[in-house]
Amino acid sequence: MPRLSEPSPYVEFDRKQWRALRKSTPLVLTEEELIGLRGLGEQIDLTEVAEVYLPLARLIHLQVAARQRLFAATATFLGDQHPDRLVPFVIGVAGSVAVGKSTTARVLQALLARWDHHPRVDLVTTDGFLYPNAELSRRNIMHRKGFPESYNRRGLLRFVTEVKSGAREVTAPVYSHLLYDIIKNEKHVVQQPDILILEGLNVLQTGPTLMVSDLFDFSIYVDARIEDIEQWYISRFLAMRSTSFANPSSHFHHYAKLSDKQATLAAQEIWHSINLPNLLENILPTRPRATLVLRKDADHSINRLRLRKL
């Protein structure tokens, strides 16, 4: 049985307890598809998909169905017997740099889109709502890129509000990690999805006014020991010397020729001056707001989960 922490709004599971909740949900991903979803340095395999992500997809599927029934009941109360469209179900995925939240979001998108009841599943990252580099420089906050103030939070809130309100077409800016900037004149078009997954560092933040987290129907925080995340970040940084950094167009091309020692020192400097302070000050404090916390071990595997009951 899962462990109840009394008094607590959460119920905790180990992996064996959680995987039993998959029931008969079929595994619909292939190894080839999973390779395309797996982020650099991530170790996720089909066993983890079956034991962790399929129960999660089943839970969300049940909640989407319940939310659709609630929407229909409200429409009946209002006398609207033929509502134009159901309200999109919005999922937030948060966590530190290098913790694997992008892989979590992509795998979840692939699984949820297999259900006939909600085949249209869109994934948007908040990177697109970073201010362009020129604006960050104008505000003298280029060194704070990734911190809450570096995002166009009003634009992000407006985007999610319009999607949630059923707008036929909503656009989001597109960010290039290669160029380290917003791509001019390029947009991500979202057209009335059944489910919208919003992935980013700070999506669970709260404030004195309406925040994007207030519009979530379900939220996930990908968690791990800080020491492990730092090591994953450094390992990824070193690996990128022969992948994205090697591209002459990359903003970080100057890192491509660094030795292991030089690259490790550079990664540690970035981690301790930017990523760690942002994690401690802004990201980690939002963890209690998540509907579900996925806890990773040092080998990247998810072995503990904490689900909010209320």
From Swiss-Prot:
Pathway: Cofactor biosynthesis; coenzyme A biosynthesis; CoA from (R)-pantothenate: step 1/5. It is found in: Cytoplasm. The keyword Repeat does not apply. It catalyses: (R)-pantothenate + ATP = (R)-4'-phosphopantothenate + ADP + H(+). The keyword Nucleotide-binding applies. Keywords: ATP-binding, Coenzyme A biosynthesis, Cytoplasm, Kinase, Nucleotide-binding, Transferase. GO terms for molecular function: ATP binding; pantothenate kinase activity. HAMAP family: Pantothen_kinase_1. This is Pantothenate kinase. It comes from Mycobacteroides abscessus (strain ATCC 19977 / DSM 44196 / CCUG 20993 / CIP 104536 / JCM 13569 / NCTC 13031 / TMC 1543 / L948).
